[in-house]
Amino acid sequence: MTNIRKSHPLFKIINHSFIDLPTPSNISSWWNFGSLLGICLILQILTGLFLAMHYTADTSTAFSSVTHICRDVNYGWFIRYLHANGASMFFICLFIHVGRGMYYGSYAFMETWNIGIILMFTVMATAFMGYVLPWGQMSFWGATVITNLLSAIPYIGPTLVEWIWGGFSVDKATLTRFFAFHFILPFIIAALATVHLLFLHETGSNNPSGLNSDADKIPFHPYYTLKDFLGMLLLILTLISLVLFFPDLLGDPDNYMPANPLNTPPHIKPEWYFLFAYAILRSIPNKLGGVLALILSILILALLPLLHTSKQRSLMFRPITQTLYWILVADLLTLTWIGGQPVEHPFTIIGQLASILYFSIILILMPISGYIENKIIKLN
């Protein structure tokens, strides 16, 4: 009699995905972040579900309902801050996951990579709409500024913005539809993540060397289930520490003021995880140009497989491109800092230079360095 996990139609899928899955024996801790993203998503869906039980998507009561959750609901404050800071942890894991993919050449798996980019856009849209729901000052003005960017689209722009708003400004209709989308999108993300995993298991995982690892594979369970469990413990420890000791560290104080359409905050800015893209948007004086740069700052990831010039997949043995990669990381941190600063000298010029450097490294310098490294290998 065969083992039930190998014969049962449902268990067989789970077995091939998480138990008997042949995995390279040398994948490092950078490969933990995929499973951590799964944990973050489950956590966000669960905490979000409990928050939705007490939240009201109406402009007159939304802010009060969030206050009610924090003050009157049993452990409501805990659930609310788990959800808010869980989003931050989600993005930290997401950025590391994408960064790992860039470093080790995982973008060679085209289907997996492209679904990953779609996932990233979907997660960003979900987070943006979630930020609008508490209906604080930054919620309202963030929604107004970001949705207004669509008016830069030629001909249909203004009509499109009013259609999204459901009126002539961000109001009750906007809040209601944002809540509806914010509720449904995580389930779409879960479905896309399953497809992402499906395509990954068609090819098998990449590994730090970027070489073929078919000759040296080990079963996923118990080796990587245990390793993922350690990552999960560290993630939960970090998140709980953040929630219990510094719950408002990553939030904006302006969001503790109820939304007021008659009073504009001095500095309108999104959550910290969008600041790099916001800085790129602001660095271009033209509205349409800024919007295009904003979209391209993420969409540029889709070009990575086409821009790969090196004969080696990973950056493990490529010191020149390695240096460029870490300059890119530093540049993204600079953009994140600039995105949170007011639009004045010297921040404007720093933002513009950092934006130029961001696109230059990916589009020009990395392909050239790959070509140079090929030449150096030939010389040896």
Curated annotation (Swiss-Prot):
<comment type="subunit">
    <text>The cytochrome bc1 complex contains 11 subunits: 3 respiratory subunits (MT-CYB, CYC1 and UQCRFS1), 2 core proteins (UQCRC1 and UQCRC2) and 6 low-molecular weight proteins (UQCRH/QCR6, UQCRB/QCR7, UQCRQ/QCR8, UQCR10/QCR9, UQCR11/QCR10 and a cleavage product of UQCRFS1). This cytochrome bc1 complex then forms a dimer.</text>
</comment>
<feature type="transmembrane region" description="Helical">
    <location>
        <begin position="178"/>
        <end position="198"/>
    </location>
</feature>
<keyword id="KW-0472">Membrane</keyword>
<feature type="transmembrane region" description="Helical">
    <location>
        <begin position="113"/>
        <end position="133"/>
    </location>
</feature>
<feature type="binding site" description="axial binding residue">
    <location>
        <position position="97"/>
    </location>
    <ligand>
        <name>heme b b566</name>
    </ligand>
</feature>
<dbReference type="InterPro" id="IPR016174">
    <property type="entry name" value="Di-haem_cyt_TM"/>
</dbReference>
<dbReference type="GO" id="GO:0045275">
    <property type="term" value="C:respiratory chain complex III"/>
</dbReference>
<dbReference type="InterPro" id="IPR027387">
    <property type="entry name" value="Cytb/b6-like_sf"/>
</dbReference>
<keyword id="KW-0679">Respiratory chain</keyword>
<keyword id="KW-0496">Mitochondrion</keyword>
<dbReference type="GO" id="GO:0005743">
    <property type="term" value="C:mitochondrial inner membrane"/>
</dbReference>
<keyword id="KW-0830">Ubiquinone</keyword>
<keyword id="KW-0249">Electron transport</keyword>
<comment type="function">
    <text>Component of the ubiquinol-cytochrome c reductase complex (complex III or cytochrome b-c1 complex) that is part of the mitochondrial respiratory chain. The b-c1 complex mediates electron transfer from ubiquinol to cytochrome c. Contributes to the generation of a proton gradient across the mitochondrial membrane that is then used for ATP synthesis.</text>
</comment>
<dbReference type="GO" id="GO:0046872">
    <property type="term" value="F:metal ion binding"/>
</dbReference>
<dbReference type="InterPro" id="IPR048260">
    <property type="entry name" value="Cytochrome_b_C_euk/bac"/>
</dbReference>
<keyword id="KW-0813">Transport</keyword>
<keyword id="KW-0349">Heme</keyword>
<feature type="binding site" description="axial binding residue">
    <location>
        <position position="83"/>
    </location>
    <ligand>
        <name>heme b b562</name>
    </ligand>
</feature>
<dbReference type="GO" id="GO:0006122">
    <property type="term" value="P:mitochondrial electron transport, ubiquinol to cytochrome c"/>
</dbReference>
<dbReference type="Pfam" id="PF00033">
    <property type="entry name" value="Cytochrome_B"/>
</dbReference>
<dbReference type="InterPro" id="IPR030689">
    <property type="entry name" value="Cytochrome_b"/>
</dbReference>
<feature type="transmembrane region" description="Helical">
    <location>
        <begin position="320"/>
        <end position="340"/>
    </location>
</feature>
<dbReference type="InterPro" id="IPR036150">
    <property type="entry name" value="Cyt_b/b6_C_sf"/>
</dbReference>
<feature type="binding site" description="axial binding residue">
    <location>
        <position position="196"/>
    </location>
    <ligand>
        <name>heme b b566</name>
    </ligand>
</feature>
<feature type="transmembrane region" description="Helical">
    <location>
        <begin position="288"/>
        <end position="308"/>
    </location>
</feature>
<keyword id="KW-0812">Transmembrane</keyword>
<dbReference type="GO" id="GO:0008121">
    <property type="term" value="F:ubiquinol-cytochrome-c reductase activity"/>
</dbReference>
<feature type="transmembrane region" description="Helical">
    <location>
        <begin position="33"/>
        <end position="53"/>
    </location>
</feature>
<feature type="transmembrane region" description="Helical">
    <location>
        <begin position="77"/>
        <end position="98"/>
    </location>
</feature>
<keyword id="KW-0479">Metal-binding</keyword>
<dbReference type="InterPro" id="IPR005798">
    <property type="entry name" value="Cyt_b/b6_C"/>
</dbReference>
<dbReference type="InterPro" id="IPR005797">
    <property type="entry name" value="Cyt_b/b6_N"/>
</dbReference>
<dbReference type="InterPro" id="IPR048259">
    <property type="entry name" value="Cytochrome_b_N_euk/bac"/>
</dbReference>
<dbReference type="Pfam" id="PF00032">
    <property type="entry name" value="Cytochrom_B_C"/>
</dbReference>
<comment type="similarity">
    <text>Belongs to the cytochrome b family.</text>
</comment>
<feature type="binding site" description="axial binding residue">
    <location>
        <position position="182"/>
    </location>
    <ligand>
        <name>heme b b562</name>
    </ligand>
</feature>
<protein>
    <recommendedName>
        <fullName>Cytochrome b</fullName>
    </recommendedName>
</protein>
<feature type="binding site">
    <location>
        <position position="201"/>
    </location>
    <ligand>
        <name>a ubiquinone</name>
    </ligand>
</feature>
<keyword id="KW-0408">Iron</keyword>
<feature type="transmembrane region" description="Helical">
    <location>
        <begin position="226"/>
        <end position="246"/>
    </location>
</feature>
<feature type="transmembrane region" description="Helical">
    <location>
        <begin position="347"/>
        <end position="367"/>
    </location>
</feature>
